[in-house]
Design a protein with these regions (language model features):
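Register position in tetratricopeptide repeats
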Residues: 19-20, 53-54, 87-88, 104, ...
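Canonical positions in the second alpha-helix
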Residues: 32-33, 66-67, 100-101
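Canonical tetratricopeptide repeat
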Residues: 46, 80, 114-118
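Terminal, low-structured helical/coil segments at or just beyond the last alpha-helical repeat
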Residues: 95-125
Length: 125
């Protein structure tokens, strides 16, 4: 088996396990994918979502930051990190991320507008 086949196999298995809500097993598959392909942006994104579901905020943030290092224009990672910062009452960082998202948004423009209102409302409290 060549490594190209193994890479996509691990990623696909991770997605299937994630869809079945087998998060620990999915996490392992995405980590295997990263061993073969350290720049697997989507694997890090899936890991961030898994850590969100497992309420491991530090690991979620770590993986979102990695996604953004690999692809500074990944709208989903920027949005999710802005939401994470908002949940921890870091309004300033959330606003900075949301402004960044608004400058590049393509798929997340509606969510960007909703998040802007949410940040403004929560930061007034």
């Amino acid at each position: 088996m060549n490594s190209l086949y193994a890479k996509s196999k691990y990623f696909d298995e991770g997605v299937n396990l994630d869809n079945k809500e087998k998060f620990k097993e999915a996490q392992f598959k995405f980590e295997q994918e990263i061993v073969f392909n350290p720049k697997s942006e989507l694997s890090y994104l899936y890991l961030s979502k898994i850590f969100n579901k497992l309420d491991k905020k530090d690991l979620e943030e770590q993986n979102l930051n990695t996604v953004m290092l690999l692809n500074p224009k990944n709208e989903e990672a920027i949005y999710n990190l802005a939401k994470l910062k908002l949940a921890s009452s870091d309004y300033k960082k959330s606003k900075v991320l949301n402004n960044r998202l608004s400058s590049i948004c393509n798929k997340f423009c509606n969510k960007n507008s909703e998040l802007k209102i949410e940040i403004e409302n929560l930061s007034k409290k």
